[in-house]
Swiss-Prot record:
<dbReference type="Pfam" id="PF01633">
    <property type="entry name" value="Choline_kinase"/>
</dbReference>
<comment type="similarity">
    <text>Belongs to the choline/ethanolamine kinase family.</text>
</comment>
<dbReference type="GO" id="GO:0005524">
    <property type="term" value="F:ATP binding"/>
</dbReference>
<keyword id="KW-0547">Nucleotide-binding</keyword>
<dbReference type="GO" id="GO:0004305">
    <property type="term" value="F:ethanolamine kinase activity"/>
</dbReference>
<keyword id="KW-1208">Phospholipid metabolism</keyword>
<dbReference type="InterPro" id="IPR011009">
    <property type="entry name" value="Kinase-like_dom_sf"/>
</dbReference>
<dbReference type="GO" id="GO:0035264">
    <property type="term" value="P:multicellular organism growth"/>
</dbReference>
<dbReference type="GO" id="GO:0009791">
    <property type="term" value="P:post-embryonic development"/>
</dbReference>
<keyword id="KW-0444">Lipid biosynthesis</keyword>
<keyword id="KW-0443">Lipid metabolism</keyword>
<dbReference type="GO" id="GO:0001701">
    <property type="term" value="P:in utero embryonic development"/>
</dbReference>
<comment type="function">
    <text>Highly specific for ethanolamine phosphorylation. Does not have choline kinase activity.</text>
</comment>
<dbReference type="GO" id="GO:0016310">
    <property type="term" value="P:phosphorylation"/>
</dbReference>
<keyword id="KW-0808">Transferase</keyword>
<dbReference type="GO" id="GO:0001890">
    <property type="term" value="P:placenta development"/>
</dbReference>
<keyword id="KW-0067">ATP-binding</keyword>
Length: 385
């Protein structure tokens, strides 16, 4: 997809300074105590009032439940005029667009949570993250929640693919948007990263509920346990800052609006405070794609360096030094290992419970194989002095 040249990055301290706390971001003393104790999902800001409807939408027959919700959210729409469009790219949830006008300028997305995804996602925290990002201009409007999902505003633009996110004009926009999100912070003490608690939670599920039925292509549970301990020991020493992260920036979660010349990130169910380098490394892994995974598309060093320079200059408002870029480069590629491990565990759980048509087991094997393939090379990367 051809992308017109964009303006140079402004370099002033004002450009992406650390954002001021918003009124929704204050924590109670109880929440601070929970975060400091190392809960698996640090709490987000208190939820503002969002309508909640006692409607359950059937996984295999979304339309009737979706139309009940539309009657509440868009009472002026005539039922016979409502059009729908099913999006089939998602591998966690099911998504339906409801609209009347052809241009979809007013369009309600109805997202139905995937089967047993409460094992993977804290849905209460997802809504808080949605509101937090919306308060900072980084998310669409959240219209309501219902018993097994939520409804929100359709973001105008094109969902990107692996062939798009490697284009310099586009990856610059992605780097700037990630830098913006990484400046969002909660009041009070900084939460602990979600990574280790989530990975331990996923591993425990695999060990206790899934391991007897694991394919021979999947590493043994004892090996996974050793690797998880190794990751925590080595990556925790890298001093990567803890920031507010998207944590799931695959291509289809990036919407490009060519009219406005900007990108918007969608789907915040895995968002939360985490290591800066994990969010970036995870995105770099997504250059390989999901449905057809090809790690030859992992960004080359030159591409990464340019991407990281855009990111750092947006964050700092000044030029990034070679040492800063090299340091982040090493951190990002090391944390990309954790991304492989995280999503491989996730895929094993999805393989057990999900009703979505996707070969989760094959995906888990691909991610584990890539983890072990690149581990020696990545482990040898030295942090600049």
């Amino acid at each position: 997809m051809a992308v017109p040249p964009s303006a140079p990055v402004p370099c002033s301290p004002f450009y992406l300074r650390r954002q001021e706390p918003c009124p929704q971001c204050s924590w109670s003393m109880e929440e601070k105590a929970v975060a400091s104790a190392g809960c698996w999902e640090p709490p987000g800001p208190p939820r503002a009032a969002v309508p909640c409807f006692s409607v359950t939408v059937e996984q295999d027959d979304i339309l009737p439940g979706a139309l009940r919700l539309i009657r509440e959210l868009r009472p002026h729409w005539k039922p016979e005029q409502v059009r729908t469009k099913r999006f089939k790219d998602g591998i966690t949830n099911k998504l339906l667009a409801c609209y009347v006008e052809e241009d979809m300028r007013d369009c309600v997305l109805v997202r139905v949570y995937g089967e047993r995804t409460e094992l993977l996602v804290d849905r209460e925290n997802e809504v808080r993250n949605f509101q937090l990002l919306r308060a900072h201009g980084c998310a669409p409007k959240l219209y309501c929640t219902f018993q097994n999902g939520l409804c929100y505003e359709y973001v105008q633009g094109v969902a990107l693919g692996p062939e798009h996110i490697r284009e310099p004009q586009l990856f610059r926009l992605i780097a700037l948007e990630m830098a913006k999100i990484h400046t969002i912070h909660a009041n009070g003490s900084l939460p602990k990263p979600t990574l280790w608690h989530k990975m331990h939670r996923y591993f425990t599920l695999v060990k206790d509920e899934i391991s007897p039925s694991l394919s021979a292509d999947v590493p043994k549970v004892e090996v996974l346990e050793q690797e998880l301990a190794w990751l925590k020991e080595h990556l925790s020493q890298l001093d990567s800052p803890v920031v507010f992260c998207h944590n799931d920036l695959l291509c289809k979660n990036i919407i490009y609006d060519s009219d406005k010349g900007r990108v918007c990130f969608i789907d915040y169910e895995y968002a939360g405070y985490n290591y800066q380098a994990f969010d970036i490394g995870n995105h770099f892994n997504e250059f390989a794609g999901v449905n057809v995974v090809d790690y030859s598309r992992y960004p080359a060093r030159e591409t990464q360096v340019q991407w990281l320079r855009y990111y750092l200059e947006a964050q700092k408002g000044t030029a990034a030094s070679p040492r800063e870029v090299e340091r982040l480069y090493a951190q990002v590629n090391k944390f990309a290992l954790a991304s492989h491990f995280f999503w491989a565990l996730w895929a094993l759980i999805q393989n057990q419970y999900s009703t979505i048509s996707f070969d989760f087991l094959r995906y888990a094997v691909i991610r584990f194989n890539q983890y072990f393939k690149v581990k020696p090379q990545v482990s040898a990367l030295e942090m600049p002095k």
